[in-house]
Swiss-Prot record:
This is Luminal-binding protein 2. Belongs to the heat shock protein 70 family. Residues 654-663 have a biased composition (Acidic residues). One of its GO terms (biological process) is protein refolding. Keywords: ATP-binding, Endoplasmic reticulum, Glycoprotein, Nucleotide-binding, Signal.
């Protein structure tokens, strides 16, 4: 919903989840009925269906087109949607929300540990996974997996669609953040099964939104950036749309950033205020927090349209009524770092897509949090004043796209959708190890799949008859810092001097994201191959994040080293140039008074000694030292020039007339 790659999950888990949707539609048509599209959101969910040549977003039994992703248990029943959310303040420990932040994660994940402290319901560790413990009727304690709670929400969406269509629904396209990893996707599919749904396809939220935007767009190629900031997750995807072909160029995001985090900041602000003003700590009072959470969300929404809102809560604690103003400026200040955090993935996706800002034709806003004026302003500023496109409904676009995808799979979309094709990308660079442990890249990250790349290698020892092919993925230059996917040997190479044999290595990623690697000795025609599949145990989101983060950290370290060397060179250059200037008769030697000369020479001598003693000082130290020396020398040089009628400070930099890097 890290930059280094198109998407955040494992190579080949299809980013759009729908590559070759069109080409496989025919074979799936037989077994699929009407396929609905479900946007299973962190805070709200939405369902749509393609009917009579267009998408219908279906209203629930309360008449609302979006349904809160909330589940609650009372002494007598289970509540889902509005009914659950509306009673949360009086039943906090038994009301479950934000379960999408738990699905497919491990209990030990730092995000889970953080969220545990913020929700009123109980999260426990079961087999290393977070489960929810809740009292159901008759005081019985029951433990639910995140998949089960998600299934309840999916079931509600299924019921909503069935009531509207008047028939049973078995199949659905369900969306996930582009940045969801394999475990999170698989868990979402499992939730579908528990809900009695065949999840015909998992597709990415920004890609689904791109379909909603681009379905009726004809005429010429367009680059669009989908900025999807929802209740709990954030995605950026850059796509090229050309008459029904949706090609993902790059994707990036954060699976733990969204409107819930903004609400939390408002809550923390008021908790502190209440403590200060009333000497009352409500941070452990679940009822008070439930009321405050509801009002924080309401205030946040209101501030998208007005500059000030009053947060009023009857009997918040000890019978005390609470009433405080919240301005838009304060809200923006409370969330400033989080809003700015959204720009990182935008920049990285742009770099990965290889596009200039001017080459983005449209910025499509998706997710309720994109209504926040500050978020829109940051995007506008980044894109040099370009206005985001507000043509799609940010709450409904994802379900809309999922419904279109459903119609392609079922064949019910007819001529209107038959030409739609989604093209996916390989999220991480793929390559092999060559001499010295070097990662030689064959398929760079964000390459559209399916793809095939070949490269010729040779032996590095005389009479070598076997080569070992080791396949890696990752962004680092050495294989020790990348992830080994598999290895195999090519035997029976004809003995020859090193560098003579020609061994062609071919990487092929098919539409399912399965990597085939083949090595062939061009001399003998002998070949070996290995198939690498996308197994569940492969890279987690955290590991991919770590690889890219490390690559970025190393790039940052390299930059710091260069800056330090530049600062040292600058100081040395100044000192030696100044030394020449004051010692050269044609320059200043004869124009300086004895006292001035002594002062300058002493400063230069001291600086050179300092340089000898501080070979590995920090950039700031070198800069500080340069300022010190300049403070002594420059005024004296300026004074000499003024006395001799030259331009004041004419060569006060000690005659530095170039800034070429020294060899």
């Amino acid at each position: 919903m890290d930059r280094a790659r198109g998407s955040a999950f494992l190579l080949g888990v299809l980013l759009a989840g729908s590559l070759f949707a069109f080409s496989v539609a025919k074979e799936e048509t037989k077994k699929l009925g009407t396929v609905i599209g479900i946007d299973l959101g962190t805070t709200y969910s939405c369902v749509g269906v393609y009917k009579n040549g267009h998408v219908e977003i279906i209203a629930n039994d309360q008449g609302n087109r979006i349904t809160p992703s909330w589940v609650a248990f009372t002494d007598s029943e289970r509540l889902i949607g509005e009914a659950a959310k509306n009673q949360a303040a009086v039943n906090p420990e038994r009301t479950i929300f934000d379960v999408k932040r738990l699905i497919g994660r491990k209990f030990a994940d730092k995000e889970v540990q953080r969220d545990m402290k913020l929700v009123p319901y109980k999260i426990i560790n079961k087999d290393g996974k977070p489960y929810i413990q809740v009292k159901i009727k008759d005081g019985e304690n029951k433990v639910f997996s995140p998949e089960e709670i998600s299934a309840m929400i999916l079931g509600k969406m299924k019921d909503t669609a069935e009531a509207y269509l008047g028939k049973k629904i078995n199949d659905a396209v369900v969306t996930v953040p582009a940045y969801f990893n394999d475990a999170q996707r698989q868990a979402t599919k499992d939730a579908g099964v528990i809900a009695g749904l065949n999840v015909a396809r998992i597709i990415n939220e920004p890609t689904a939104a791109a379909i909603a935007y681009g379905l009726d767009k004809k005429g010429g190629e367009k680059n669009i950036l989908v900025f999807d900031l929802g209740g709990g997750t954030f995605d950026v995807s850059i796509l090229t749309i050309d008459n029904g072909v949706f090609e993902v160029l790059a994707t990036n995001g954060d699976t733990h950033l969204g409107g819930e985090d903004f609400d939390q900041r408002i809550m923390e602000y008021f908790i502190k205020l209440i403590k200060k003003k009333y000497s009352k700590d409500i941070s452990k009072d679940n009822r008070a927090l439930g009321k405050l959470r509801r009002e924080a969300e309401r205030a946040k929404r209101a501030l998208s349209n007005q500059h000030q809102v009053r947060v009023e809560i009857e009997s918040l604690f000890d019978g005390t009524d609470f009433s405080e103003p919240l301005t838009r400026a304060r809200f923006e200040e409370l969330n400033n770092d989080l809003f700015r955090k959204t720009m990182g993935p935008v920049k990285k996706a742009m770099e990965d897509a290889g596009l200039e800002k001017s080459q983005i034709h449209e910025i499509v806003l998706v997710g309720g949090s994109t209504r926040i004026p500050k978020v829109q302003q940051l995007l506008r500023d980044y894109f040099d004043g370009k206005e985001p496109n507000k043509g799609v409904n940010p709450d409904e676009a994802v379900a809309f796209g999922a419904a279109v995808q459903g119609s392609i799979l079922s064949g019910e979309g007819g001529d209107e959708t038959k030409d739609i094709l989604l093209l996916d990308v390989a999220p991480l660079t793929l390559g092999i190890e060559t001499v010295g442990g070097v990662m030689t890249k064959l398929i760079p990250r964000n390459t559209v799949i399916p793809t095939k790349k070949s490269q010729v290698f040779t032996t590095y020892q005389d009479q070598q008859t076997t080569v070992s092919i080791q396949v890696f993925e990752g962004e680092r230059s050495m294989t020790k810092d990348c992830r080994l996917l598999g290895k195999f040997d090519l035997n029976g190479i004809a003995p020859a001097p090193r560098g003579t044999p020609q061994i062609e290595v071919t990487f092929e990623v098919d539409a399912n994201g399965i990597l085939n690697v083949k090595a062939e000795d061009k001399g003998t025609g002998k070949s070996e191959k290995i198939t690498i599949t996308n197994e569940k145990g492969r890279l987690s989101q955290e590991e991919i994040d770590r690889m890219v983060r490390e690559a970025e950290e190393f790039a940052e370290e390299d930059k710091k080293v260069k800056e330090r060397i530049d600062a040292r060179n600058q100081l040395e250059t100044y000192v030696y140039n100044m030394k020449n200037t004051v010692g050269d008769k044609d320059k200043l030697a004869d124009k300086l008074e004895a006292e001035e000369k002594e002062k300058v020479e002493e400063a230069l001598k001291e600086a050179l000694e300092w340089l000898d003693d501080n070979q590995s000082a920090e950039k700031e130290d070198y800069e500080e030292k340069l300022k010190e020396v300049e403070a002594v020398c420059n005024p004296i040089v300026s004074a000499v020039y003024q006395r001799s009628g030259g331009a004041p400070g004419g060569d006060a930099d000690g005659g530095v007339d170039d800034d070429h890097d020294e060899l």
